[in-house]
Every structure is written in C-alpha cells, then in structure tokens.
Amino acid sequence: MDKNTWIGFALIAAIVVGFSFLNRPSEEELAERKRVQDSIALVQAQELEAKLISEQITAQLQDEQVATTPSEDLALQLAAVYGPFAPATQGQEGLITLENEKVRIGVAYRGGHIAKAELKDYKAYGDSVNPLCLFQNDENSLNFTLVTNTNRILVTQNMYFTAANQATDAEGNTTLTMRLNTNIEDCYLDFVYTLPADDYMVGMSIVPHNMQLALAQNMSAMEMQWNQSIPQQEKGRKFEERYAQLQYMFVGGDIDKLSEQKADRANESARIKWIAYKDQFFSTVMIAEDAFESTTMESAPFNPSSRYIKEYKTNTSLALDITGQKATNLRYYLGPNHYNTLKAYDKDVISVEKLHLNELVPLGWKIVAWINKILVIPMFDLFMSWGLHIGLVILLMTLVIKLILLPFVFASNKSTAKMRVLKPQLDEINAKYPPEKMQERQQATMALYQKAGVSPMSGCLPMLFQFPILMAMFWFLPTAIELRGQSLFWADDLSTYDAIITWNTPIPLFGTHLSLFCLIMTVVNIVYTHITMQQQSGGQEMKMMRWMMYLMPLMFLFFFNDYAAGLSYYYFVSLLFTIIQTMIFRWTVDDKKVLAEMEANAKKKGSQKKSGFAARLEAMQREQQRLAREQAKAQMKR
C-alpha cells in the first residue's frame, strides 16, 4: 500500500474514534441509566418478595378456612415489605364501570387503572351486536412506582384501591375517585377520573394527601410503566399492521414515531407531551399536562398467528408533589382516528398548547397532506353531511375532481388529436429512416413537431395535476374511518379488501384472495390503455412502450389486491369517467379541421422571422447532422 492509502486509513480511524468520543454519554446520563437499571432490578426483587408473602397469607387463610387476620409473623413481614401501604395488599377484585354517550370504561380495583375500554359507536369486525373493545383484562396495564420513607420501592399494580367517591353532575359528567389507603391517618393517594358526558377524552388526576408521611421526603417524581397489547380489530391484518404504530409528540410540537414494520425502541431525554398507541382506526393516547421525562418506548409485532398485532411499552417519569399542593394531571384519549374529532381538541387553543392529535391520521407527504386537508376532507365531509351513501359520496367526489381537472384534460386531448393527425407523416418518417438511423429519425420527427406546433410532452400536463390528487385519495380512503363497516354491492366493508375467491396457499406478491373491485378496476384500466394506445404513432420503439403500458394495469392488480375496496372503487369510477371524457372528445373533434388548423399555423410560422434562439438551435441541428454524415463516411472508408 502506498503512502496515501495509509493516510486514508489513519483519517478514517481518527474520525471513528472522534465520533465515538463526541457521542459518548455524559456522566449525568450514565448515572441516570444506572439509577433506572438499579431501580428496575430492585422493583422486580421486591415484587417477588411481596408476591411470596401475599401467597403465604392466602394459603394460611385457606387452610384455616376462616376470615381471620393473618398470623402475626406474616403480618410483620407484610408490613416490612409494604410499610404504611400494608392495608392495600388485600382488597376487592373487579371493575367499576363509567360510561357516557361515546365510551364505556372499566377501572380496576387492583392497580386503580383503566383496564377496559369500549367504543359505543363502533363494532368489531364480524360482530354487529357488541361495541368495539379497545382493550380488556391484561391487555392494558398502567403502573406507578412509589418509594416509601423506609426506602422500599412499591408498585401500584400490586395494590388495591377503594372507590372513595363516584358522582355524576346535572350535565352528565362523571367523577370517580380511586383511593390507595395507608395505615396512617389522613394519608392516602387518589386517582381521580373524570369522564365528560359526550367525549372520548378521560381526565386522570393523581392527588396525594399528606403522602410525605408515607413516601420518601426527596421523592419529587415517580416512574410510570404503560404497556398495551393491540388486538386485531379489522379483516385485513396486513393493512392493520401497516398503520399500527407508536407515535409521540415532544413539548414544542415535533412528532416522531417508532417503526411500524419491525421491532423498534427509542430513548428520549427531551420532554414529551403525549404518547399514542395507535391501531389502523383507533388509538389510546396518554397526554401529560406538564410532560413525560426520560422516556423509553418500545414497539414489537406479534406473530401473524396471534390475535394481537403489536405490543407497545413505555417507561417514563412524571413530576409528583407528595404534599398534594399540586396534582399530577393526565388525559386519556380513547377513540377513533377521525381527523375532525382529533383536530377539534385544538379548537380555541393557542399555538404553543396545540396537541396536533390529528397528525395520528396519515394523510401522506406534505403536498399530498395539504391537498387532503384543504380539498379532499372538506369535500368528503360536505357530501357525508347530506346523508348520502358512502358509495355515492365517492362517486360525487370523483365527478368534482374531474370537473376541476377538465381544462387540463381538454388541453391534453387536443394535443393527442394533433398527434393522431400527424400519425401518417410520422409513419412515413419511420419508413424512410430505419432503426439504424435513429438519430436522423428523431431529428426528422422533432422537425415535424416544430413545424406543426405540437409538443409531445403537452399530454403529460394533466397527469402532473392529477397525480397529487390521486395520491391524496390513495392516502385518505384507506384510513377514512367513515368507510369502516360500510357496504357497497358485494363488498361488506369498504375499508378492507372485497374477496370473492379465497384459497389456502399464498401466491407470492398476491396473497390468498382475489378482490373484485380491484379486478374490475384492472379491466377498466386495460380498456383505457387500449384506447390511449390507439391514438399513438407507430414505430418499432412504440411496440415496447405498448407492452409496458399494458403491463402497468396488471401490476396494479397485484399492488391493490390487499387495499381497501373503497380505494379500488374510486380508481374504477375515475377511470370510467376518463374513458367517457376521451370518447366524447374523440367524437366531437374533426381531424380534418385540426389538420387544416395545424397547416395554417405552420405557414404562419414559416413566414415569420425566427428568433435568435430558434435560429441558433436550427444551426446546431444542421451541424450535428453534418458531423454525423462525416462520421458515417469515415467508418465506410475503414
């Protein structure tokens, strides 16, 4: 190796070492990591100890078969583990139910957290009777870590709360207070839940009362662990997995997310405002009044054979005033990923305090999302407000979009007509210049276009305007919850695929079913391609283009087979309107008049003096032709 190679290796090594040095964690970060690891290990050890003691007490009570207090030695052990919280080790199992017009939640006595949530306005796929259940039993767990004044670390999920108060006011707002008692007089911890009369948002306040008597004096924050397993709610598991992901927003408004395709993990030292456990159409969002600190989040997919699709985990820290002078306030959003519903939570809210929950609805890239927000969603909401069937709504949206694009489509069809009129002359050029003289053929073709005043690229202009709208609908329809459960013809749910044939062995890139709307859309696309290609010029190079154009619809059949039937229905209707527009234009345009107009323009241009740029361009073309002829002669002499 030469000197430069050794220098290169040395520089690379220096960069690697320098990068490692600059990115190593600080002493404070290392200390925080060690504290978290130590506390987790200590919690696990003490949980095991408490569990063993609790099992001993239960076994003794069963042996004695009397409702007496445990023996003195076990009671002492229990007090040693739980300290003033020993009374909370025994209690009532079950849930307390709260409900309003939209949700029904169950708050568990053990742990004092929301253990069940149902959405009254929605049904699970294949169940037309029972409300959709977001989670139940052990699918959702919320746990807080407490440090006692004897430096014991306890977790709320192992302790029993009591229902201290439950009341509903005249407006239908319900309040429930779950209390964690101690053996110290007037010393307890309250979880206060507030359920408005007609909302998906549930308030949760953590209110200590004289807890400085039971907890460590230096305890100013508590760790929180929130885990949830997301059950499959939809027919199409593949799409549900694609849209299910963990998202979170920093204080300040920036939104980030974990991977929806594979297991992922994030360690965030920055303050976080909310964390969302998201499914395709529904979300559970935890919102902090202040912020979540030092947060670790994980997301992992389940095996395809499981009834669950994703598992989410969060470990974070919340500020806590143990004197109770200030409550720690949280909010739960338990509801649909409906754009307007989520956006309404930012109404009349100053910019810095906006939650931006509507970003949970994926609307595509910036320009595509912008089109969805200012055009597609308002138009969709308008037609839906008329009480129309969802199929008619999509039909009207297609018609409006086609009317908006009509001027551009007209210009494209006019350009196509000119190309069609020039087809005989283009065929003559192709016959005159064989494929071996491709450069001369292209020059003659461009000269014809220039003379006739035709631009072969002008037909692409409408596609430039149509493409963002097509992409906007591509993003909007599969995530529009209004399509969920809505039927049209043979499709029983427009939010998922409409299989008419199924089989057991998966076909690569296709799956185990055939969607009828997708098949119809493909057939109509082939018909449109055939009509379009009939108007194109011939030539050897166009034969390959034709095959490619016919291949595209077949590729769409594979691509859209798993997509929402509502999206395939939209593309089918859109293509049908396009074919009708093309045929009407073809029937109303006189090719002879177009040819006469082009000849008149050509004569007019021929009488006009060429611009300096046009003259220079023509001179360059002549020079290229001369050089090409000289090169050909030189090769023949050899």
Locations of the language-model features?
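Short, Gly/Pro- and small/polar-rich lid/capping loops
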Residues: 59-93
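Soluble non-transmembrane domains of integral membrane proteins
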Residues: 88-355
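Intrinsically disordered/low-complexity terminal segments and short unstructured peptides
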Residues: 4, 67-68, 155
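Helix-loop-helix
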Residues: 1-62, 107, 197, 206-209, ...
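Compositionally biased amphipathic helical and low-complexity segments enriched in hydrophobic
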Residues: 31, 49, 53, 62, ...
